[in-house]
């Protein structure tokens, strides 16, 4: 990370934790499972050999082969790994300005890293430029000192034919750190976990330093195995450095919204990038093109964009090919894409949508059955930045589009379930990823939605790249809006099968407020309030359950 004189490093880290808290997970169980797998399956004689290699003043192609072979073994034993899922981002959920901002930062990051990697034959310069290395050498000579290798984080050792083979072979992995401390330190894994957890708890309020490590080591002797040498760029994952230990500790802390526990999936990648850019603007974060360690924003930007799927901070990434700016690209050539994407050629970037061409065609056909000249209601459940249900309903025909989405913020979801929609997570855990956003992206530009309360709907449309869609807010009072609620539930309640939780009243402690809020039935209820009567038109779904939910069981009649 950059020095405190350049950026308010820890403040940035805290801001990123808050801004990306919806995407953090409880990773402790997964980390310990992989650590046990490594303890049982890894050849620690090979680990010792690689550790010796990393202490050598000059390393050869044979040494690199040992490192890469061991990295492959580690990767094969782990569940927490990053997958090669190259992404091409287009205007949609991310606006043109956001994409340009992202592209600019990736280009700056590329220049920063390439400048730091610039080297003569067989020399890796680490954190210093050639001019800085020469100046340092002159100063040392003038003071009567002989320059020593491995000082100030500089590694000038890789005398190899193909430097590209070094890419993604470094970086610590918490499961590996725990396994090495347990086996090579002859410590009980539980003791190692306790020691690292203390380090992780300290990390929630400050960056732990060597003084902190010394003090914690008195209560946790296992921490004495952590090296006191300053961490450098491209340090091996087998080095028991302070930064590696802190990262491992962060994964073991329950809560704290630690960035290390972020899990990237194809359906939340754009959401994470969007949230990252929001925090960046709020804190005025930037990419510093000067060679050196990455600041918190540079660090998370690189890690997120490297693979597009997996655990960017703590998963194995040694099998990922390419750099962040190669694996995540920005395409500003088109506005909103309504039709199915073109097939991907071999070696090309994958499209971001998790849906197949056939599924995209079903969505397109369903939307085509809505009459854009007639009233169309829209309603959601959950906040606009994390919706769990979407309904689009046309009263004149009874046609409707209805889908669900697994939330990122489970705590907020449970609160919404308790006091509003009554959806249970188990009832929507197999909801199709990416469906809700693709429906919104495929809507034609001329559509005008009718709704009860437009603020959340407009935010939803804005966040999904559809600020062009207009809304009409009926602005009923609460009593007016829900006048026909009981009748509609009696007549059409069979359509609502995913709202099975008990809903409590916020006004009356312990009281039940009656029926949960279902986005589809709410559309019908609001239309009844507008017409003064409940419709006789039978609602007809436009999307099959097999698309709305993955592995939806088929019942033979």
UniProtKB/Swiss-Prot annotation:
InterPro entries: Nucleocapsid_arenaviridae, Nucleocapsid_C_arenaviridae, Nucleocapsid_C_sf, Nucleocapsid_N_arenaviridae. Zn(2+) binds at residues 389, 496, 499, 518. It is an enzyme of class 3 (hydrolase). Mn(2+) binds at residues 379, 381, 522. One of its GO terms (biological process) is RNA-templated viral transcription. The keyword Manganese applies. GO terms for molecular function: hydrolase activity; metal ion binding; RNA binding. The N-terminal region is important for the cap-binding activity while the C-terminal region contains the 3'-5' exoribonuclease activity. A CCHE zinc binding site is present in the C-terminal region and may thus contribute to the substrate binding and/or the specificity of the exonuclease activity. HAMAP family: ARENA_NCAP. Belongs to the arenaviridae nucleocapsid protein family. Encapsidates the genome, protecting it from nucleases. The encapsidated genomic RNA is termed the nucleocapsid (NC). Serves as template for viral transcription and replication. The increased presence of protein N in host cell does not seem to trigger the switch from transcription to replication as observed in other negative strain RNA viruses. This is Nucleoprotein. It comes from Latino mammarenavirus (isolate Rat/Bolivia/MARU 1924/1965) (LATV). The lineage of its organism: Viruses, Riboviria, Orthornavirae, Negarnaviricota, Polyploviricotina. The gene is N.
């Amino acid at each position: 990370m950059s020095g405190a004189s350049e950026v308010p490093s820890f403040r940035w880290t805290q801001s990123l934790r808050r801004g990306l808290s919806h995407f953090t997970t409880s990773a402790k169980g997964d980390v310990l499972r992989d650590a046990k797998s490594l303890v049982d399956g890894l050849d620690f004689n090979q680990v010792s050999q690689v550790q010796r290699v990393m202490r050598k003043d000059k390393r050869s192609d044979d040494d690199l082969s040992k490192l890469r072979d061991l990295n492959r073994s580690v990767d094969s034993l782990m569940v927490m790994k990053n997958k090669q899922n190259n992404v091409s981002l287009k205007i949609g959920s991310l606006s043109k300005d956001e994409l340009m901002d992202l592209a600019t930062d990736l280009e700056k990051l590329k220049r920063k890293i390439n400048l730091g990697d610039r080297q003569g034959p067989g020399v890796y310069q680490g954190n210093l430029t050639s001019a800085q290395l020469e100046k340092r050498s002159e100063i040392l000579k003038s003071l009567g000192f002989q320059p020593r290798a491995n000082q100030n984080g500089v590694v000038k050792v890789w005398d190899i034919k193909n430097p590209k083979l070094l890419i993604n072979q470094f970086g610590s992995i918490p499961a590996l750190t725990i396994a090495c401390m347990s086996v090579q330190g002859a410590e009980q894994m539980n003791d190692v976990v306790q020691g690292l957890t203390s380090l992780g708890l300290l990390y929630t309020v400050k960056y732990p330093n060597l003084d902190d490590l010394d003090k914690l080591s008195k209560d946790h002797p296992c921490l004495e195995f952590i090296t006191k040498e300053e961490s450098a760029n491209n340090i091996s994952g087998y080095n028991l450095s302070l930064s590696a230990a802190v990262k491992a500790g962060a994964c073991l802390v329950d809560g704290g919204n630690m960035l290390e526990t972020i899990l990237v999936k194809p359906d939340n990648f754009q959401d994470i990038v969007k949230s990252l850019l929001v925090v960046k603007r709020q804190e005025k974060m930037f990419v510093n093109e000067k060679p050196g360690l990455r600041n918190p924003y540079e660090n998370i930007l690189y890690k997120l964009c490297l693979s597009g799927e997996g655990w960017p901070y703590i998963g194995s990434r040694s099998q990922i090919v390419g750099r962040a700016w190669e694996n995540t690209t920005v395409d500003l050539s088109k506005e909103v894409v309504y039709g199915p994407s073109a097939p991907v050629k071999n070696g090309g970037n994958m499209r971001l949508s998790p849906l197949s061409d056939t599924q995209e065609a079903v969505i397109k056909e369903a939307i085509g059955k809505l009459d854009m000249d007639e009233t169309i209601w829209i309603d959601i459940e959950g906040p606009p930045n994390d919706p769990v249900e979407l309904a689009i309903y046309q009263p004149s025909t009874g046609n409707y589009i209805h889908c669900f989405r697994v939330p990122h913020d489970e705590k907020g979801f449970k609160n919404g379930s308790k006091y509003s929609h009554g959806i249970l997570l188990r009832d929507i855990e197999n909801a199709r990823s990416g469906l809700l956003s693709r429906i919104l992206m495929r809507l034609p530009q001329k559509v005008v939605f009718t709704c009860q309360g437009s603020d959340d709907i407009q935010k939803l449309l804005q966040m999904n790249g559809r600020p062009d869609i207009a809304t009409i807010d009926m602005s009923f009072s609460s009593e007016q809006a829900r006048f026909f609620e009981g009748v509609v539930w009696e007549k059409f309640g069979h359509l609502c099968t995913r709202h099975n939780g008990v809903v409590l009243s916020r006004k009356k402690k312990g009281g039940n407020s009656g029926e949960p809020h279902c986005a589809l039935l709410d559309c019908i209820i609001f239309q009844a309030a507008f017409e003064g009567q409940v419709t006789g038109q039978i609602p007809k779904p436009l999307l099959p359950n097999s698309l709305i939910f993955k592995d939806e069981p088929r019942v033979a009649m």
